[in-house]
Swiss-Prot record:
The lineage of its organism: Eukaryota, Metazoa, Chordata, Craniata, Vertebrata. Belongs to the GARIN family. It comes from Homo sapiens (Human). PANTHER family: GOLGI-ASSOCIATED RAB2 INTERACTOR PROTEIN 6, PTHR22574. Pfam families: GARIL_Rab2_bd. It comes from the Eukaryota. InterPro entries: GARIL-like_Rab2B-bd. This is Golgi-associated RAB2 interactor protein 6. Signal peptide: none annotated.
């Protein structure tokens, strides 16, 4: 039996995100299922590939290559009605032909299959907004105040508009008035106190963080990305292999 057929669906009856997690498995979820991150092995996940862009929508590249990011939204417990964790990963090795141009926004060929998990972020410390719905761009703001921008890079054989799911996610996690980046809504994570931190530590998210920290082969450090766009904090964990 295929591995993907063995994964259960966590379908809380009151969950507005139920349909999102009943999509087919992506490469990050398949990799986590087969790997040693047991905390995420059976967790339902919705994921897509993105390219990192600037606020003006320009592609951020390194050595003439677009910076690919796989973002996964995870529900760590079947008791939860909403997702609670964001995972960010990047290709461990980039294939020569794996590029995503700003004109087509389609991958010419699949990127390397092996992904490197780089971030585990509690969603309560991340604000996701729609930066540009026409260009399928998202704005992610961390509790530290750091921001970065991602543009959806769907597979060439995609049979549906995946950005619709991301738009739905934005509205599920935030009230409509805060859904777009041009509002002046205040990020709740900017006013963190000890009670919030204690709540996180007792939650499945806190267990996941502790699990990742205790694994000997991993160390917590800053993400190897644009220093002006990323920072390190207690709620912004980076896992290096």
């Amino acid at each position: 039996m295929e591995d993907c057929c063995m994964l259960p669906y966590y379908t809380a009856q009151s969950s507005p995100a139920m349909g999102m997690f009943n999509t087919s498995m992506g490469k990050l979820q398949r990799q986590l299922y087969k790997g040693e991150y047991t905390i995420f092995r059976y967790a339902p996940m919705f994921e897509s590939d993105f390219i990192q862009i600037s606020k003006r929508g320009e592609v951020i590249d390194v050595h003439n290559r677009a910076r690919m990011v796989t973002m996964g939204i995870v529900r760590t417990s079947p008791c939860l009605t909403l997702p609670d964790v964001m995972l960010l990963a990047r290709p461990a090795a980039v294939c020569d032909n794996a590029r995503c141009g700003p004109a087509t926004q389609k991958r010419e060929s699949p990127p390397a299959e092996i992904l490197e998990l780089t971030r585990l972020l509690p969603l309560m410390f991340v604000k996701i907004t729609i930066h540009n719905s026409v260009k399928k761009q998202l704005h992610l703001k961390l509790a530290t105040g750091r921001s970065f921008y991602l543009q959806l890079c769907p597979p060439s054989d995609a049979s549906e508009d995946l950005f619709v799911h991301w738009e739905n996610l934005v509205y599920i996690l935030r009230p409509p008035v805060e859904a777009y980046s041009d509002t002046r809504a205040i990020l709740a994570g900017n006013t963190l106190d000890s009670s919030v931190l204690e709540e996180v530590q007792r939650s499945p998210v806190g267990y996941a963080m502790k699990f990742c920290e205790e694994k000997e082969q991993f160390r917590i450090s800053r993400l190897h990305m644009n220093a002006e766009m990323f920072g390190s904090t207690y709620c912004d964990y980076t896992i290096e292999i």
